[in-house]
Regions:
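An active-site-proximal "capping" alpha-helix that borders the catalytic cofactor pocket
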Residues: 32-35, 77-93
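Membrane-helix interface segments
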Residues: 47-49, 100
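Active-site flanking loop/helix segments enriched in acidic
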Residues: 7-31, 63-73
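Divalent metal-dependent phosphate-bond-processing catalytic cores, especially two-metal-ion Mg2+/Mn2+ enzymes
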Residues: 2-3, 17-46, 59, 96, ...
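Amphipathic alpha-helix face/heptad-repeat signature
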Residues: 25-28, 79, 104
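Short helix-capping and hinge/turn segments at secondary-structure transitions, especially at repeat
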Residues: 41, 64-68, 88-92, 96, ...
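His-Asp-centered metal-binding catalytic motifs of divalent-metal-dependent phosphohydrolases/nucleases
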Residues: 50-72, 83, 105-112, 129
Length: 175
């Protein structure tokens, strides 16, 4: 097993332990992680950026539990506020390098603030999260093509969206 795989596995287990029996949150994290890995395979990021992307996919919504506890809301601004501290705590327990933790925490703390996207690691996380949110019904089928057109930048993410949601037959112009 490669070091990146071991780090990802440790953080996945940390996320599962943190969420406990909250299968909805755990399942969402695994789906976003899966799509992020798929996009990563097509985009070929350097190893450290790939690790950051994968860890962020696992931990992007980790602030929900604290947001609900402290603010009685899972609103995105509270997730962004509470997420980085929880993410850092999980990663510290897994021996993740501080530089990697800092970047994961930055993205986790801004993952619904699309104007803050500043690199391919952040971009891929956003695309993977949107792919899952479309499937889970948080974005309507009518709104999905415009979301993809506005926010997707990677060719792999665009191709996945077109294939998954039936836009492939309509051609790339639908996106």
């Amino acid at each position: 097993m490669y070091m990146r795989d071991m780090e990802e596995s440790a953080v996945l287990l940390g996320m599962v332990r943190y969420f406990g029996n909250d299968i909805k949150r755990i399942s969402h994290a695994f789906k976003v992680y899966g799509f992020a890995r798929a996009i990563l395979s097509g985009e070929r990021l350097p190893e450290e950026k790939a690790l950051i992307t994968a860890l962020t996919a696992i931990l992007h919504d980790i602030g929900i539990k604290e947001a609900v506890r402290k603010h009685h809301s899972s609103d995105s601004r509270f997730q962004e506020m509470e997420g980085p501290a929880v993410a850092r705590s999980i990663m510290e327990g897994c021996g993740i390098h501080p530089h990697v933790m800092d970047r994961v925490c930055f993205i986790t703390g801004h993952h619904h603030t699309y104007s803050k996207i500043d690199g391919p690691d952040f971009q891929i996380l956003v695309e993977a999260d949107f792919l899952v949110n479309i499937h889970e019904g948080y974005i309507t089928p009518e709104a999905a093509p415009s979301v993809v057109k506005k926010y997707f930048r990677t060719s792999t993410g665009k191709d996945l969206a077109a294939s998954l949601y039936g836009w492939a037959n309509a051609g790339k112009s639908a996106l």
